[in-house]
């Protein structure tokens, strides 16, 4: 699986690797809103750590749908997920998850995410890496050109907000 180092020459990353001005504005991102639901909480009454994984993946799903890349589901396994938990979120609280593409490698896609509750402070921050693996492939496969173009040029997408 391709989880190569960010200085890989064919990688596009925020702020370096290509020298292209404005590259950070070209990489896709999205903000989604959800509520902390009853099954999201633990015995202490605040959100369970595993809920952040679902919120990050829900943001990824919304982003890929917006980009017309829903067909990638099933061919982009996660190879890394990490999160730092900074604040509690409580049942019923509105939660905003921002997911940003930070790097597009030959076959990898790196995301960063931030989860906010109703306050300004981040409740969780983290990153996730997926790789492209075509059907029946035994490992990672390069992004098709059309997919790579979208992943490197689509820019911020409209938010998916609660009504």
Give, region by region, the residue ranges found by the protein language model.
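Core beta-strand residues in small-molecule sensory/regulatory alpha/beta domains
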Residues: 114-117
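Beta-sandwich strand segments
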Residues: 121-122, 140
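Hydrophobic beta-strand-centered segment that forms part of the acyl-chain substrate-binding groove
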Residues: 61-109, 123-125, 130-131
């Amino acid at each position: 699986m391709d989880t190569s180092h960010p200085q890989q020459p064919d990688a596009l990353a925020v702020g370096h690797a290509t020298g292209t001005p404005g590259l950070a504005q070209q990489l896709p991102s999205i903000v989604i809103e959800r509520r902390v639901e009853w099954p999201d909480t633990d015995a202490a009454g605040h959100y369970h750590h595993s809920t952040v994984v679902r919120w990050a993946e829900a943001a990824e799903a919304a982003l890929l749908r917006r980009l017309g890349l829903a067909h990638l589901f099933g061919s982009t396994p996660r190879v890394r997920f990490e999160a730092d938990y900074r604040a509690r979120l409580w049942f019923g609280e509105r939660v905003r998850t921002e997911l940003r593409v930070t790097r597009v490698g030959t076959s990898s896609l790196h995301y960063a995410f931030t989860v906010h509750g109703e306050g300004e402070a981040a409740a969780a921050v983290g990153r996730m890496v997926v790789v492209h693996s075509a059907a029946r492939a035994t490992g990672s496969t390069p992004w098709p050109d059309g997919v790579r173009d979208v992943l490197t040029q689509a820019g911020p997408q409209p938010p998916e907000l609660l009504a």
